[in-house]
From Swiss-Prot:
Signal peptide residue numbers: 1-19
UniProt keyword annotations, A-Z: Disulfide bond, Ion channel impairing toxin, Neurotoxin, Potassium channel impairing toxin, Secreted, Signal, Toxin
InterPro entries reported in the protein's UniProt record: Long_scorpion_toxin_alpha/beta (IPR029237)
Domain BetaSPN-type CS-alpha/beta: 54-91
Species in which this protein is naturally found: Mesobuthus gibbosus
Top-level lineage group: Eukaryota
Pfam families: Scorpion_toxin_alpha-beta (PF14866)
Compartment(s): Secreted
Organism ancestry: Eukaryota, Metazoa, Ecdysozoa, Arthropoda, Chelicerata
Disulfide bonds, paired cysteine numbers: 57-78, 64-83, 68-85
A GO molecular-function annotation: potassium channel regulator activity
Function of the protein: Inhibits voltage-gated potassium channel.
Family membership: Belongs to the long chain scorpion toxin family. Class 1 subfamily.
Cellular component terms (Gene Ontology): extracellular region
Designated name of the protein: Potassium channel toxin Meg-beta-KTx1
Amino acid sequence: MQRNLVVLLFLGMVALSSCGLREKHFQKLVKYAVPEGTLRTIIQTAVHKLGKTQFGCPAYQGYCDDHCQDIKKQEGFCHGFKCKCGIPMGF
């Protein structure tokens, strides 16, 4: 039952995030929907980690460049799931 709830919450968060809702909205939803305990802590941690990622980075080649040009007027590079402005990949 708890696994189904977690999957349902995750899919709901993914669907709502495409509508422009931010991490704080999801944290509030988790706070009221999930009882206090270990499960809530795990879900809140997952929401925070997902909120920090930029999924367009690996999926769309020019996402980071467009993102960094808008913000800092620098060239953008994809580092995993995060865009870094002006910091090239160092292998």
